[in-house]
From Swiss-Prot:
The gene is CRK1. This is CDPK-related kinase 1. May play a role in signal transduction pathways that involve calcium as a second messenger. Serine/threonine kinase that phosphorylates histone H3. Confers thermotolerance; involved in the heat-shock-mediated calmodulin-dependent signal transduction leading to the activation of heat-shock transcription factors (HSFs); phosphorylates HSFA1A. Residues 390-420 are annotated as: Autoinhibitory domain. It is a lipid-anchor. Disruption phenotype: Impaired basal thermotolerance. There are 3 contiguous domains conserved in the CDPK subfamily: a kinase domain, an autoinhibitory (junction) domain and a calmodulin-like domain. The autoinhibitory domain (390-420) inactivates kinase activity under calcium-free conditions. Residues 123-385 form the Protein kinase domain. Its EC number is 2.7.11.1. Ca(2+) 1 binds at S442, N444, Y446. Binds calmodulin (CaM) in a calcium-dependent manner. Interacts with HSFA1A. One of its GO terms (cellular component) is membrane. The lineage of its organism: Eukaryota, Viridiplantae, Streptophyta, Embryophyta, Tracheophyta. ATP binds at V129, G130, R131, G132, H133, F134, G135, Y136, T137, K155. It comes from the Eukaryota.
């Protein structure tokens, strides 16, 4: 269901220039790479750019191996991923024996969705405009009602393809999400959903401007920085909106963004929520979905949240700016290993000629540690994009998560965070100022825990209710804590991990420690520090905490200060 808006049939042979690619054909001695046959790891998210097999004709340029920093040892993650996806969508049994379509796996499945069955009386189908693994998309015209005479897109999903309960649930959830989220200017407009005995029909806005992928190809494989900024702002805007509602897309790629019209100023529209899911701010997903070249490392590790979408946006940004993908290989196994282990190349052209801000933007999205990645709202405030848009920055759920942790922290850690917040620069404070303003501070400049709930209600949709974001926010609003001014809000909403990802982290940490020495540091016994950290009796505190305290005066050392900022857990300490 994830690619029913897939590339049109006539676009199969498209290719995109790739840095370092040659025209040398592979030798016949090379065996062809196996393809999984699943849309989530389709051989070609960007058709010929992302080749699935070296066994192609000599007329098609081959892709030489990129030189990685180190070899990748087995085992490969690909086999268990393919098996997992097969079980999810009913292609094979757990032992990978093929199941005939419509047989054992369909027994007892209820494929009735409760949608209207009057599709034929409302719309007349025209030609097919795209085809995916689980369905296809057609253009159609409204016969009556408010859409009479209007062209629309109809995503047709055959019920014969719904061979598992999970597949049926995915279709139901996609419709529910589109219905709840529709209205954002960069999200395809949803009109209605129908069904009959054979198919489900999802009626949406018809976008005639083509895929973002097509535009990349028309421009010779890449965008100028200014044009790339315009694309990124639109992608980040709709993704920030979805993430606030507790929706993670899970299949962001150039094919899933369409231009509304062929006009140069046409808005970009996000499509295909077939793989999307709800995610609560304090929960993680574990099912493996996505498209191989855009999948985040933590997805392969089966523990991820909205940060996985930000990785995919980083891959799109990389392609827009240089025309090459950051991670690639001839096989799926190689792609996964590259995503997990390899680093993107920022040394080859055109990267040295691009602005430092552009390079930093991409690097901060393609960080393998999801905790260090920018959120969509933060990315809109990045120096590379500031000044290129006038969007109102939306509320950011990471603020709510950080504030919750801050309130539950010890007084010692709060003092350390307060010192770190004082080292932030004016551009770094701009994002926090935006978030503070969205919370609606009083005339005296203070916010209470109730402000968090009130602010989120202003942006709520039915999707937010289904994702249980409300439950999380309500829990924060019920916490007993004093009102916060902007200075303490900065300390509470500061992500140490994200700051650590910056090149200026060392300066921030050293300067913060100097401030902490003056205002917050004090003599502390190891036992007291262990109690402050909530360490249990099983932790050998005199061993793991001895470097945290200076022997000269019994105060926190710089190492102890930095680790305290991170809120080191007892589990982390035991690994140290």
């Amino acid at each position: 269901m994830g690619i029913c808006h897939g590339k049109p049939v006539e676009q199969q042979s498209k290719s995109l220039p790739v840095s370092g690619e040659t025209n040398e054909a592979p030798t016949n001695s090379q065996p062809p790479a196996k393809s999984s046959g699943f849309p989530f790891y389709s051989p070609s998210p960007v058709p010929s750019l992302f080749k699935s097999s070296p066994s192609v004709s000599s007329s098609v340029s081959s892709t030489p191996l990129r030189i990685f920093k180190r070899p990748f040892p087995p085992p490969s993650p690909a086999k268990h991923i393919r098996a997992f996806l097969a079980r999810r969508y009913g292609s094979v049994k757990p032992n990978e024996v093929s199941i005939p379509e419509g047989k054992e796996c369909e027994i007892g499945l209820d494929k009735s969705f409760g949608f209207s069955k009057q599709f034929a009386s409302h719309y007349e189908i025209d030609g097919e405009v795209g085809r995916g693994h689980f369905g296809y998309t057609c253009s159609a015209k409204g016969k009556k009602g408010s859409l009479k005479g209007q062209e629309v897109a109809v995503k047709v999903i055959p019920k014969s393809k719904m061979t598992t309960a999970i597949a049926i649930e995915d279709v139901s959830r996609e419709v529910k999400m589109l219905r709840a989220l529709t209205g954002h200017k960069n999200l395809v407009q949803f009109y209605d959903a129908f069904e009959d005995d054979e198919n489900v029909y999802i009626v949406m806005e018809l976008c005639k401007g083509g895929e973002l992928l097509d535009k990349i190809l028309q421009r010779g494989g890449k965008y100028s920085e200014d044009d790339a900024k315009k694309v990124m702002v639109q992608i980040l805007s709709v993704v920030a909106y979805c993430h606030l509602q507790g929706v993670v897309h899970r299949d962001l790629k150039p094919e899933n963004f369409l231009f509304s019209t062929k006009d140069e100023t046409s808005p970009l529209k996000a499509i295909d929520f077939g793989l999307s899911d709800y995610v609560k701010p304090d929960e993680r997903l574990n099912d493996i979905v996505g498209s191989a070249y855009y999948v985040a490392p933590e997805v392969l590790h089966r523990t991820y949240g909205t940060e996985a979408d930000m990785w995919s946006i980083g891959v799109i940004a990389y392609i827009l700016l240089c025309g090459s993908r950051p991670f690639w290989a001839r096989t799926e196994s190689g792609i996964f290993r590259a995503v997990l282990k390899a680093e993107p190349n920022f040394e080859e052209a055109p990267w040295p000629s691009l602005s430092p801000e552009a390079v930093d933007f991409v690097k901060r999205l393609l960080n393998k540690d999801y905790r260090k990645r920018l959120t969509a709202a933060q990315a809109l405030c990045h120096p590379w994009l500031v000044g290129s848009h006038e969007l109102k920055i939306p509320s950011d759920m990471i603020i709510y998560k950080l504030v919750k942790v801050y309130i539950m922290s010890t007084s010692l850690r709060k003092s350390a965070l307060a010192a770190l917040a004082k080292t932030l620069t004016v551009p770094q404070l701009a994002y926090l100022r935006e978030q503070f303003t969205l919370l609606g501070p009083s005339k005296n400049g203070y916010i209470s825990m109730q402000n968090y709930k009130t602010a989120i209600l202003k942006s709520s949709t039915d999707a937010m209710k289904d994702s249980r974001v409300f439950d999380f926010v309500h829990m924060i609003s019920c916490l007993q804590y004093k009102k916060l001014d902007f200075e303490e809000f900065c300390a509470s909403a500061l992500s140490v991990y994200q700051l650590e990802a910056m090149e200026t982290w060392e300066q921030h940490a050293r300067r913060a420690y100097e401030l902490f020495e003056k205002d917050g540091n004090r003599p502390i016994m190891i036992e007291e520090l262990a109690s402050e950290l909530g360490l249990g009796p099983s932790v050998p505190v005199h061993v793991v905490l001895q470097d945290w305290i200076r022997h000269s005066d019994g105060k926190l050392s710089f190492l102890g200060f930095v680790r305290l900022l991170h809120g080191v857990s007892s589990r982390t300490l035991q690994k140290a």
